[in-house]
Amino acid sequence: MDSLCLNSGLHGVIPAITAVGNGGCGGVVEVRATASAPSQKRGPFGFSFKYPLTPFWSRGGGGGIASRRRSGLCLDDAVLVDSGDSRKPIAEETAVEMDTERRNGSWVLKILDVQSTWKHEEEEDDDEVEDEDGDEDEEVELDDAVVSEDDGGCDVCSVLEDDGNEANKFQLDRESFSKLLRRVTLPESKLYAQLSYLGNLAYSISKIKPANLSKYYGLRFVTSSAEKTESALKAENGEVSGETKPIVEAEEEVEEEEKNKSRKISASAAYEIVASAASYLHSRTNNILPFNSSSKAENSDKHDVNLTNAESSSDVAYSVTSVVAAEEDVKQAVADDLKSTISSPCDWFICDDDQSHTRFVVIQGSESLASWQANLLFEPIEFEGLGAIVHRGIYEAAKGMYEQMLPEVKAHIKTHGTSAKFRFTGHSLGGSLSLLLNLMLLVRGEVPASSLLPVITYGAPFVLCGGDRLLKKLGLPKSHVQAIVMHRDIVPRAFSCNYPYHVAELLKAVNGNFRSHPCLNKQSMLYSPMGELLILQPDETFSPGHELLPSGNGLYLLTSDFESPDIEDSDEERLRAAQTVFLNTPHPLDILSDRSAYGSSGTIQRDHDMNSYLKAVRSVIRKEVNQIRRAKREHRRSLWWPILVARESGSSGIAVSNGQINGQDFSGMMQTGRKSLQRFSRLVASQHMPLIVVMLFPVKLLFLGAFNVFSFR
């Protein structure tokens, strides 16, 4: 999923803009390219704007219209897909062959694909004189919008007052943060492992073998997005003949090759540009980080921005910003394309557990061009007329997938009636889509709340503002949404980290929907966490531990601390503060400023990949199972120990009550006899009779028996 971008100037606006300063609601200050941003209590941010942020970047050479409009550097945390082995289903490792070239595709080049689809929109504005006039008009409109925002109330003041308030109120370190963590039980971990396995399969749906799915997990494969798309295309256009289809595919391959040749930026060069941009911005804003993730941030190297690749980086930056700041008719065209029932922005598949009558809907993350368009159209709109605010691009994509899946939902209810259950899950963008689809089925009356099992997401961005309030309004508990987040995954932090004040003002300037966005105005974030937040920490050999979490791997539920609340509702406030601190530690800018974060072997890929989630959950289960086995072994030894003590006492001439011995023997046999009988039956069945003596009798008991025999002789 998703991207974080910073651009270097306002698209279509002269470098000086009028914005509300920190001196009060009525104050107006002028921000210029040579002036630093007003000092506010805020965190750093990397995100995408069509109108770049001029004060952050200096630019040498050429200052024409084109250079003013396409300046900026893009910071993106896309799902960097690795080669074959990283996404192989565990049960089918030897059978699945991944498409290496597709899986290693650069997220920057994927963004360039998005840019190419929007290029024709800019060709209409080639005349420089008309552009200059339009820029001046737009400047007046934006300035008026910023100034007039204070007429209805002091939203800016509330941003400044509320920003970081809860986090500062509750000082959280590792010790205090650990008190808010509860280890997930073994049955819950096994459920999460099963769903993470299905989420991993979603990236290779064409390779799924229904027989293996049934063998390992007892699930029956039902259908997939590929089958739905094929059926829709046949119904609309008719089936393509066998002779024509290869010709069409060949033409498409030629067009794709030409498109690739037209690109003037390589993945390695793009990573260098992005890392330089993030590092430079990190050095400029390091002193205003509200949640400093580590001491390394204070001692990080300050890299100079290399603007020799400005032409290439501007293509990337512009493609990221072109969607959210485009005209409404253009954005509506993208929305219509996203909710098309013919194609799906993310692949998905459905499988059934016939014993529990549960239908699993599994959705993959960002892979296609359509999914990237959904990511980039991040402006807020209302969700289903219920007052909650939602990410527009993902909401529009969910509408199209809703129409595709609805027949399968109705068919399952028709077959099983009130006993029908639905479990939605997904990774990255797929997790956000799973949540919206689940809620849409309930709101639209297609599925009762009793049939909807909790939604479980992996590394998914939060896409709702007022989500917890919406759950309460629908009569659902917070546990209905369970968001599993890798300890250093950048994607869940993308929309929920703290945004600087001036970035919030720029968002309001380029898109009117942000001006009344409550999360941005009062919490300095785009979309707030909702439901339950579960934190997954893998082994330290795989990824360094998190500074707020206990050492070692584990899966924790972040919950309220109910010990002696200081004030009313302090538990809920403490929980929100803990979520805020965690989602800003490390801050996305800290992650992006590290050059080792990029590429198929970078930390972004490592901490966000679905296969990493699967491996981490399974390692937690192994650790828990080993602890349980160790505890049972110690328990059995404690039950047999009195027998050994009694025999030793008898052999040394010490009198011991027979009733005491018999009672201890009887208690031990009652608690361990069944296990011993099971072991004995397995040994008999395997014809390993010589091992019975070794297995049934402890070593000490054998030595004592032998000693007694020799002593009598």
UniProtKB/Swiss-Prot annotation:
Principal cellular location given in the protein's record: plastid
Region (Disordered): 118-140, 232-261
Catalytic residues (UniProt): S428, D489, H608
One of the GO biological process terms: lipid catabolic process
Assigned EC number: 3.1.1.32, 3.1.1.26
Record's subcellular location: Plastid, Chloroplast membrane; Plastid, Chloroplast stroma
Short motif GXSXG, span: 426-430
Gene induction: Induced by abscisic acid (ABA) and cold stress.
Keyword 4Fe-4S attributed: no
Keyword flag Transcription: no
Any GO molecular function: galactolipase activity
Reaction(s) catalysed (UniProt annotation): a 1,2-diacyl-3-O-(beta-D-galactosyl)-sn-glycerol + 2 H2O = 3-beta-D-galactosyl-sn-glycerol + 2 a fatty acid + 2 H(+); a 1,2-diacyl-sn-glycero-3-phosphocholine + H2O = a 2-acyl-sn-glycero-3-phosphocholine + a fatty acid + H(+); 1-hexadecanoyl-2-(9Z-octadecenoyl)-sn-glycero-3-phosphocholine + H2O = 2-(9Z-octadecenoyl)-sn-glycero-3-phosphocholine + hexadecanoate + H(+); 1,2-di-(9Z-octadecenoyl)-sn-glycero-3-phosphocholine + H2O = 2-(9Z-octadecenoyl)-sn-glycero-3-phosphocholine + (9Z)-octadecenoate + H(+)
Biased composition (Acidic residues): 122-140
Transit peptide: 1-32
Alphabetically ordered keywords of this record: Chloroplast, Hydrolase, Lipid degradation, Lipid metabolism, Membrane, Plastid, Transit peptide
Function: Sn-1-specific phospholipase A1 that catalyzes the initial step of oxylipins and jasmonate (JA) biosynthesis. Hydrolyzes polyunsaturated acyl groups preferentially from chloroplastic monogalactosyldiacylglycerol (MGDG). May function downstream of abscisic acid (ABA) and provide a link between ABA-mediated abiotic stress responses and oxylipin and JA signalings. In vitro, possesses broad substrate specificity.
Protein name as catalogued: Phospholipase A1 PLIP2, chloroplastic
Gene: PLIP2
